[in-house]
Amino acid sequence: MIKLVLLRHGESQWNRENRFTGWRDIDLSEKGLAEAANAGVLMKEEGLTFDIAYTSVLKRAIRTLWNALDTMDLLWVPVEKTWRLNERHYGSLQGLNKTETAQLHGEEQVLVWRRSYDTPPPPLEKTDERYPGNDPRYASLSSEEIPVAECLKDTVARFLPYWHETIAPQIKAGKKVLIVAHGNSLRALVKYLDNISEEDIVGINIPTGIPLVYELDDDLKPIRHYYLGDQEAAAKAAAAVANQAKG
């Protein structure tokens, strides 16, 4: 049986402050560092090991991966970083407090921006200092590849080619894979793996720092999936993600 492990980064400083983060490179909070280490403990207790790991080019995911692997004594595992695993780009909302944004625009509108499949938030101007085209880590990307705002549909479109061309072949070759990424890049993969509809993906929330194990058949079709550790705590953490924009 194939096991694929997905892990959303630990709590970031902006998660703690309830701000839209997107492609802004915000580090982990103290709680997030502890979550990352605890994720490593949970995976080690489960008897998991890895041959290769994938993560984004954002430090909150990279540091989560480091801390988890360090706890497992697996820092030697090869790591591939890709912008295709970045969080979805939240456009001009990046840096804004979610509750204050909901008070300004209404909870329903913010829910659409946060969780709908095909409605992006207001775009970022390319003259804005937050525009990723100004960041050297994206120097190899074309202007068409660099987003000014993304909906989940856009995130799926940029991630799935990497899944099919890079990650899936490694899994089929027998490699044990860990993916440490972000709420929406992982939702994009979960939507694909579980064949979740555009309507139902709105209700899927992934908590920080809790490993999600997928058991797959030889065609990489899911047999089942489950969070490691306390299931009730995982459910409460996922519900808390859903409530972030509420007052």
Swiss-Prot record:
Keywords: Gluconeogenesis, Glycolysis, Isomerase. Belongs to the phosphoglycerate mutase family. BPG-dependent PGAM subfamily. It catalyses: (2R)-2-phosphoglycerate = (2R)-3-phosphoglycerate. InterPro entries: His_Pase_superF_clade-1 (IPR013078), His_PPase_superfam (IPR029033), PG/BPGM_mutase_AS (IPR001345), Phosphogly_mut1 (IPR005952). PROSITE patterns: PG_MUTASE. GO terms for molecular function: phosphoglycerate mutase activity. This is 2,3-bisphosphoglycerate-dependent phosphoglycerate mutase. Substrate binds at residues 8-15, 21-22, 60, 87-90, 98, 114-115, 183-184. It is an enzyme of class 5 (isomerase). GO terms for biological process: gluconeogenesis; glycolytic process. The record marks 182 as: Transition state stabilizer. CDD domains: HP_PGM_like (cd07067). The keyword Isomerase applies. It holds the Pfam family His_Phos_1. SUPFAM superfamilies: Phosphoglycerate mutase-like. Pathway: Carbohydrate degradation; glycolysis; pyruvate from D-glyceraldehyde 3-phosphate: step 3/5. The active site is at residues 9, 87. Its EC number is 5.4.2.11. Catalyzes the interconversion of 2-phosphoglycerate and 3-phosphoglycerate. The gene is gpmA. It comes from the Bacteria. It comes from Prosthecochloris aestuarii (strain DSM 271 / SK 413).
